[in-house]
Amino acid sequence: MDRYEARHLIDAYTASWTDREIDRFLATLSDDAVVIECDGSSVRGLEETGAWFDSWHAWPIGGRVTRWTIRRFLCDEAAAAIEWEFGCTCHGRSAAFPGASLVAFDAGRIASIHEYKRLPAESEAVQTGRGQE
């Protein structure tokens, strides 16, 4: 997959979330795709990922992606590393944070996505021991 095709596929994936379009979402994924969320939870295959997509948007979560902006996009024919800014509303609360995804491609679709969320600076200092003299 060339850079243009990879970027187009990632843009379709993120737009499917902001537009709440499950058919477009599923069209970006391989039949046995794996999505690993920032919290470590995962879904596999079109049936499970479709149910996850639907449940995230439905009550009681009521999820709504308000923005998903790609800041940096690096790729080769098999994979991509992406930095992004994400905004959403869940359970009636708004959230926004930077993050990154590692994406593997197979036959023109997404085979796997592993998402990472950047921690707030205070949490990073505690986890790394920085700032604790």
Regions from the PLM with identified roles:
Residues 77-79, 107:
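Residue-level signal for tight coil/turn positions that link beta-strands
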